[in-house]
């Protein structure tokens, strides 16, 4: 589910406060591509503007730093999630993009949310394999009606 190019640069720039080099669109959200990972780390989005978009999320990404291939932040205030701490769905969109740009199938991604996290992804064509450390935060049983 990689994104396709779309000209939403002015709207995304207004929402994120920094003009992206390129914007992509996918069913889950818009993707803003930047050249500088520091821009992603320092980003202070206008969440009301982000919430007004016609997609669930706005994903900001750039080449990586400190050993990571890429960095990412994901904002989804329209569904009650100002910033997703670590978003697997967004990686289904950005990993094919970065795999192509970087010329490699295995991508180490660092999500720069306040909680943060590292994901180790592999582009296998129709499937994106995502792995990393996790922490159990809730345990229970869900019962669905017959």
Describe each PLM feature range.
Residues 1-146:
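Active-site proximal loop and beta-alpha junction motif in alpha/beta enzyme cores
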């Amino acid at each position: 589910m990689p994104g396709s190019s779309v000209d939403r640069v002015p709207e995304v720039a207004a929402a994120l406060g920094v003009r992206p080099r390129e914007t992509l669109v996918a069913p889950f959200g818009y993707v803003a591509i930047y050249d500088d990972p520091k821009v992603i780390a320092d980003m202070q989005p206008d969440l009301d503007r982000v919430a007004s978009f016609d997609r669930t999320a706005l994903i900001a990404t750039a080449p990586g730093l400190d050993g990571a291939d890429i960095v990412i932040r994901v904002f989804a205030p329209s569904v009650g999630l100002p910033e997703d701490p670590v978003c697997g769905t967004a990686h289904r969109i950005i990993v094919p993009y970065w795999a192509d740009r970087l010329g490699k199938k295995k991508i180490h991604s660092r999500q720069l949310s306040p909680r943060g996290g590292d994901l180790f992804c592999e582009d296998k064509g129709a499937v994106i394999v995502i792995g990393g450390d996790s922490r159990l935060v809730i345990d229970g049983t869900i019962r669905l009606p017959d």
